[in-house]
Amino acid sequence: RPPPPRAAVLCQAAGACFSAYLANGSYAEASSACSRWRGGLAWVSGEPELRLLLGLLAEATAGPAPSLFWVGLKKSAFACTDAEQPLRGFSWEVAGGGTAPREVPAALGRWVKEPLRSCVTARCAGLQLAAAPGGGHSWGWKE
């Protein structure tokens, strides 16, 4: 089955590429689709990568309505939500057994709504992007 229409592609000088596909689906479906195409859901190590990803997603969105894009942000059933941490106890799920950064800059701790407090349920989060008043876009993680 062919992939959904690709909305945008952006590659870094270091060789990593991000692509956004517009489709309605669950976290598991998005992760599986990325795996089929030898990729993985995006993860962000710092502000430069975040700016790159936000630019790509802004290019992919159409209209002022908020859009939610699945990224590799997940909380295992054995981890607790932690309001003191930027990612609130969530961590980056990396395709192919790679490792994501453990230290996360505070600037990445922007949530549209605080995630549900839990120590027993696996949870997933995406990156929500919305048109901001006066131009530009607002963003935040959202369960």
Give a label for each model feature.
Residues R6-L10, A30-S32, E59-A62, E114-L116, ...:
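Beta-strand elements of modular eukaryotic interaction domains
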Residues F18, N24, L41, L87, ...:
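Cys/His-rich zinc-coordinating "finger/knuckle" motifs
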Residues G25-K75:
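Conserved hydrophobic ligand-interaction patch in extracellular adhesion modules
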Residues L52-L53, A79-D82, G135-G136:
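Extracytoplasmic/secreted cell-surface and envelope-processing proteins
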Residues P64, L68-A130:
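Surface-exposed ligand-recognition segments of extracellular binding domains, strongest
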